[in-house]
Amino acid sequence: MDMPREGDRSFEQLVEHSLEPAYVIDPLDDRILEANRAGCAMLGYTHEELLTTPVSQIHPAELPQMREFLDQVLRDGQGSTIKLTCRTKIGTFLPTEMSLHAFESDGRLRILGLVQDRSEHRQRDPED
């Protein structure tokens, strides 16, 4: 199933109103193109700040794993999940689980990332 196109109003509303943090990124330019309120709040950035923050700044400690994972998602085109840490605006690291899905918009590859904060799960389940 193809992902809806960027600019599709129902897709935009679904992402914006999701309770889970959601991001649309350009994997080739290391840019966050869009983020919903939950995504901004999780990382502590305003919407405008986040759109000017490189993806590599959010994942500095695991950049090689992140790039390899993005390559896999782009190659397979299907969703996949990975556990990575995200660096917040204030510099703390947050354990997360990300589900990434590739789609095309205006002839360019994009990634939709749905992210779960795993820190609360860790407190309840130290084995995770």
What are these regions (language model features)?
Residues 1-10, 116-128:
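PAS-associated C-terminal cap
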Residues 22-24:
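Short hydrophobic secondary-structure edge segments in sensory/regulatory modules of signaling proteins
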Residues 30-33:
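Conserved hydrophobic beta-strand signature of PAS-family and PAS-like sensory domains
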Residues 39-50, 61-63:
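PAS/PAS-like sensory domain cap-loop motif
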Residues 60-71:
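PAS/Per-ARNT-Sim sensory domains
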Residues 73, 85-91:
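PAS-family sensory domains
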Residues 83, 93-97, 110:
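Beta-strand residues that line the small-molecule/cofactor-binding core
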Residues 98-114:
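Short loop/turn elements at sensory-signaling interfaces that couple input to output
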